[in-house]
């Protein structure tokens, strides 16, 4: 069965400058647990460009511990952009208040992203990859992914329709190209610019997606 990942407060932070009340977070986590979500991506952990952004943009381990301690069956994670990654933010997954780290990258930074994944895995973090701007993945990018020796360290690789521009046929073509590079678990992150987020997500499930992203009330979709 497909897994569900909620990224309401990470993606939705674009609407609130990554400020949310504790009450909102705990209420959201309760809903996610009741509906058997697997993953909750609570926010970003980005090192650079923090000015004017709230605590869910950088999600220190100390800050999110109060939520992590009451996660019940959820796995709680953070996203880091490759271009905003700093090793000091991720000392050791065994003592950090996260279950997973999702690394977001645009196609031109895939090589650096794979190196970041290796660093995080060596530090005991569970790793996911997110390939942004999926429509612009080129042969050279698929080749990098195919040649990576450590595919198995990534729990899943996400295809992200960053600009909400793909349709179901685009998704099928790109999904199959990525599958051919040797990754067992492929997931999908939609946006709703063309009102296709739901239908594209259903298409991804039919293609065998490992997990699908959602936000409550379509926040920042």
Model-derived segments and their meaning:
Residues 156-221:
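Catalytic alpha/beta core domains of metabolic enzymes, predominantly
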Residues 1-66, 70:
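Conserved N-terminal beta1-alpha1 strand-loop-helix module at the mouth
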Residues 39, 44-147:
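Active-site beta->alpha loop and helix N-cap motifs at the rims of alpha/beta catalytic domains
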Residues 125-170, 174, 178-181:
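Glycine/proline-rich, positively charged
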Residues 1-17, 73, 96, 126-132, ...:
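N-terminal small/glycine-rich loop or linker at the start of catalytic domains
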Residues 12, 32, 101, 157, ...:
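Conserved, mostly hydrophobic/aromatic
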Residues 11-13, 48-53, 83-87, 106-110, ...:
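Short, small-residue-enriched loops and turns at beta-alpha junctions
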